Amino acid sequence: MTKTMLRALKGETLPTPPIWLMRQAGRYLPEYRATRAQAGDFLSLCYTPDLAAEVTLQPIRRYGFDAAILFADILLLPQALGADLWFETGEGPRMSTITDMAGVTALKGRDDIHETLAPVYETCRILARELPKETTFIGFAGMPWTVATYMIAGRGSKDQAAAHKLKDTDRPAFEALMDRVTEATIEYLAKQVEAGCEVVKLFDSWAGSLKGQDFEDFAVAPAKRIVSELKARFQGLPVIAFPREAGEGYIGFAEKTGADCVAIDNSVSPEWAAEKVQAGRTCVQGNLDPKYMVTGGEELVQATKRVVEAFRNGPHIFNLGHGITPEADPENVTLLVETIRGK
């Protein structure tokens, strides 16, 4: 097996870690901005397979990353379930809201999502054909808690208050929504794998707002269910889980859920994560602060070397602790890749 990304996910410690970046297809790249303008708007870009495949390929052509991640959005799934979704300029995503059991029961079933998502699967098929043979192809979905927070509040929020309120005041409706999203997520990811994805990543952007038993019930348990069902269908399928800002919750997350790799954010130090999470055996992905993609220079070189050094005694995939920002300088990404690969 020659793909370095897959070797790391199988638990191999490599002399040079594979590298890719969250949001590597994004607004920091002039070629992305040009293709997005051609699409007209963000959702049209997601749902036009040729253009979505093109923006997925752009950072691979430019930087030779070890992995490409499907260009899509975690909110395409709730849209496929029947939620209204639109993007406000400068404001981000907006959705119709679910506040009770009636809203949950009005959603489509898990087998009725594929008509809406068919263009995403076509994007996967194009990329499976066109990606370089050494590049690993990652599919993804949002985790149920994070997706549910948007479906309940109708927008992103700093504290996920609306979702916590529903969880605490109408537990049956909340749990029914989580179940619906979990089931649909499994079917969505299965179709991505059937269309050519080699790895799947689960993004739980708001996992950090779940504390104590809630973290176990609504971050760990859904991840475990998704991982086990996918691995039952696709033997040996590698899964990366990213319970962002989980802190101590990162410890043992891979073991509890069956994920092959845990992605970590930059609120924890690489040294702490190497000792507590990687522990010489668990694959860890991360965790350079995205700010260095803006500042660059010797600061970037030293911070990059620190991350590589911290994780060098176990399986490691180099990434940022969060998505690369629109302010990043493309030249700094070149410097990052050269630093890691010792060019």
From Swiss-Prot:
PROSITE patterns: UROD_1, UROD_2. Substrate binds at residues 23-27, 42, 73, 150, 205, 322. It catalyses: uroporphyrinogen III + 4 H(+) = coproporphyrinogen III + 4 CO2. Keywords: Cytoplasm, Decarboxylase, Lyase, Porphyrin biosynthesis. Pathway: Porphyrin-containing compound metabolism; protoporphyrin-IX biosynthesis; coproporphyrinogen-III from 5-aminolevulinate: step 4/4. GO terms for molecular function: uroporphyrinogen decarboxylase activity. The keyword Chloroplast does not apply. This is Uroporphyrinogen decarboxylase. The gene is hemE.
